[in-house]
């Protein structure tokens, strides 16, 4: 199971961020995702040979233009990440500007090409209907974008709806690795995600990571 631990609390200081990441690293997580300002602080804690250190780009709303987003990706790579989490431009998706979405992805890929950078995209499933989500995932497939988060996890969310959206994308895009985002994970959610075939989950809580590891060892 792919487990991503993410920090989205901008009030979190560097010391606390290090403490949280140190807590989850020993649990064998797959990825750590942080804002740009925490990359250098956290880099020494992540084994880049076996784990992803990723940076949020244009998070959470995806409101910047392509040039700004590409520049942010370039700076994150220079800072030391081996992965980037890109927020889907909501205005493009809402207005079904699929060609513009392709242009945006192409520009991001050009920055990452040859640098062994994993590109992951973040959607906000509540903003788009299923037809739009499916079309966007087809575009991801065409660009060999393999990791998709159906939700930012930034806003108040219904985890059950999130899991339903994740399962829908998984069923319609078998080549994509769907990672479900959520804050409060209970055993019933762990059970649902384990049975669903979804690739993994993202959490913002070290406590959830520990609980999931215990759940897996007990089952």
What are these regions (language model features)?
Residues 1-78, 135, 139:
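Conserved N-terminal beta1-alpha1 strand-loop-helix module at the mouth
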Residues 1-15, 167-179, 186-219:
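Alpha/beta catalytic cores of nucleotide-metabolism and tRNA/nucleoside-modifying enzymes
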Residues 34-52, 64-68, 91-112, 128-133, ...:
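Active-site-adjacent beta->alpha loops and helix N-cap segments on the catalytic face
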Residues 59-60, 79-93, 142-159, 183-184, ...:
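Glycine-rich phosphate-binding active-site loops on the catalytic face of alpha/beta enzymes
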Residues 64-78, 128-139, 169-180, 184-201:
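Catalytic cores of alpha/beta
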């Amino acid at each position: 199971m792919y487990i991503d631990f993410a920090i989205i609390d901008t009030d979190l200081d560097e010391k606390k961020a290090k403490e949280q990441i140190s807590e989850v690293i020993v649990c064998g997580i797959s990825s750590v995702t942080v804002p740009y300002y925490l990359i250098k602080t956290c880099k020494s804690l992540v084994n880049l040979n076996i784990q992803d250190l990723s940076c949020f780009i244009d998070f959470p709303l995806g409101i910047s233009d392509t040039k700004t987003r590409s520049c942010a990706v370039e700076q994150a790579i220079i800072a030391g990440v081996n992965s980037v989490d890109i927020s889907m431009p909501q205005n493009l998706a809402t207005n079904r500007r699929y060609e513009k979405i392709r242009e945006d992805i192409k520009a991001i890929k050009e920055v990452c090409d040859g640098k062994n950078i994993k590109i992951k995209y973040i959607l906000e499933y509540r903003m788009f209907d299923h037809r739009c989500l499916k079309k966007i995932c087809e575009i991801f497939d065409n660009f060999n974008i393999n990791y998709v988060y159906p939700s930012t996890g930034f806003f108040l969310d219904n985890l059950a709806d999130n899991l339903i959206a994740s399962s829908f994308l998984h069923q319609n895009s078998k080549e994509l690795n769907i990672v479900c985002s959520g804050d409060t994970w209970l055993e019933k959610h762990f059970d649902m995600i384990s049975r669903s075939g979804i690739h993994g989950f993202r959490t913002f809580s070290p406590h959830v990571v520990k609980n999931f590891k215990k759940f897996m060892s007990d089952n």
